[in-house]
């Protein structure tokens, strides 16, 4: 990890932070500093000890995925945000680089996702899995150059929220994400997946909120 998290949005009920690559959202028992630790320390520095204690992440990103992570700051409104997660009321868009030239312009990938029985780290497409939908739109097809293979720059909208959903769905289409060490080929650049934006109606104020995190890499 070589960058500090950045606050993108904050009010009395919600905080959005731009997570850098290499940082985990929740503790894994190793004592490694997490994005939740960062957010809690920031709230304490702002003099808001209650929020620092009550805060809960509303979404999670894999270690190498960058971008928007939302935190609920107030116990009284936490159930409203939890219900929004259940209802898929957050519109989430990701930017990603996929291997190869995708020959369609837009597609709804509708394939159930289950745990991989042969590798506990992985998920897989399988009939026994949970319903999973990912909408993919090709933004640009990048021709091979300077020794780099052909790649596709894509916008991805999550319609459900399964573990590794984007990675599994793109790999199932034979276009794994660039740098994916589980479902594709590991590369020094790391995983090219960025949680770019979140849009929703604020459950307390009724405002339409749109939050964006700048993409840390160029397609």
Region spans (language model):
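RNA pseudouridine synthases
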Residues: 1-127, 140-143, 147-148, 192, ...
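Pseudouridine synthases involved in rRNA/tRNA modification
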Residues: 1-14, 20-26, 130, 144-151, ...
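Well-ordered beta-strand positions in beta-sheet-rich domains
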Residues: 93-95, 106, 110, 133-135, ...
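A structural micro-motif recognizing beta-strand termini
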Residues: 99, 155-159
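Long C-terminal interaction/binding lobes of large macromolecular proteins
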Residues: 136, 154
